[in-house]
């Protein structure tokens, strides 16, 4: 099962939060406060699917920044310091491995709002946790990219892949909805319906995503943060990750291993966790060296001679 979620705003404030189930909540203009943030999180937590199924937004960064806006404004310095601390930890790991990178993407932000624990993963999703239950939300737009490698709009993706666009009334009144509080209040029912239809379109597009991959014989991952999640699921299904470890142990035992390691100045994989880790394998479908990888020789069945 898939649930789509969406927000509607006016002058940068959350006014409507809805899901494809048809349920929604609304907030008064100029009155969205910290207590309302908890109300919104409660709606998402109780409405969202936990376990089997997926909860998806379209361009999730916008939605969670709007939902959390009062908290972000009040705790700006705290969140800034938290991000700095995690970036410094990444840099420390980079130094330990002989690599230093200025690219600080996908930093995890964790914080507490009322009884809810949140973890945000930039441009990919967020998790709401209460006691032992966690509800995950993902970005359906990550699977619909334009030729310029940017997210398609919901309207464009719907028309291209489902031959269904966004609601015409909403498209016609989009500007007034976003800037005129009196218009928003007068048409709250229509705007809520428009928001729910966007939720349904988001859910249908994500269903199309899953169907497309399954038609190729691929299992869809439990946590689809990005296209790389599909790739990693494929590797797990074919035990490629385990085979990589076996190959690595063979190479590591060779006398020339140190030369290989010392000459390597490529990408850096970072693990966010506490404790001792052994034999970690990771992979990413978006390689920085696609041309070189296409020229690699297939060494299946080869023997190493030292």
Task: Name each region found by the language model.
Residues 33-54:
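Short, basic/hydrophobic alpha-helical segments
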């Amino acid at each position: 099962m898939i649930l789509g979620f969406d927000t509607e705003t006016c002058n940068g404030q959350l006014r409507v939060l809805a899901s494809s189930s048809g349920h929604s909540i609304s907030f008064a203009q100029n009155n969205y406060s910290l207590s309302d943030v908890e109300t919104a999180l409660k709606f998402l937590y109780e409405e969202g699917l936990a376990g089997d199924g997926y909860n998806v937004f379209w361009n999730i960064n916008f939605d969670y920044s709007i939902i959390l806006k009062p908290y972000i404004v009040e705790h700006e310095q705290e969140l800034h310091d938290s991000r700095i601390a995690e970036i410094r930890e990444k840099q420390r790991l980079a130094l330990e491995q002989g690599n230093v990178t200025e690219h600080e993407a996908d930093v995890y932000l964790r914080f507490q709002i009322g009884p809810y624990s949140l973890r945000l993963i930039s441009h990919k999703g967020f998790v709401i946790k209460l006691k032992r239950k966690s509800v995950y939300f993902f970005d359906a737009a990550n699977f619909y990219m334009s030729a310029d490698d940017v997210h398609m709009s919901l309207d464009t993706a719907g028309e291209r892949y489902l031959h269904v666009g966004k609601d015409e009334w909403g498209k016609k009144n989009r500007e007034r909805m976003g800037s005129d509080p009196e218009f928003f209040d007068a048409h709250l029912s229509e705007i809520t319906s428009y928001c729910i239809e966007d939720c349904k379109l988001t859910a249908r597009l994500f269903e199309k995503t899953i169907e497309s991959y399954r038609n190729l014989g691929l299992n869809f991952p439990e946590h689809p943060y990005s296209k790389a999640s599909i790739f990693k699921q494929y590797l797990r299904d074919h035990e490629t990750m385990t085979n990589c470890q076996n190959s690595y142990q063979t190479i590591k035992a060779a006398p020339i291993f140190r030369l290989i390691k010392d000459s390597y100045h490529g990408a850096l994989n970072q693990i966010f966790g506490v404790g001792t880790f052994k034999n970690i394998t990771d992979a990413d479908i978006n390689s920085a060296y696609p041309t070189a990888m296409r020229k690699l020789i297939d060494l299946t069945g080869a023997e190493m001679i030292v």
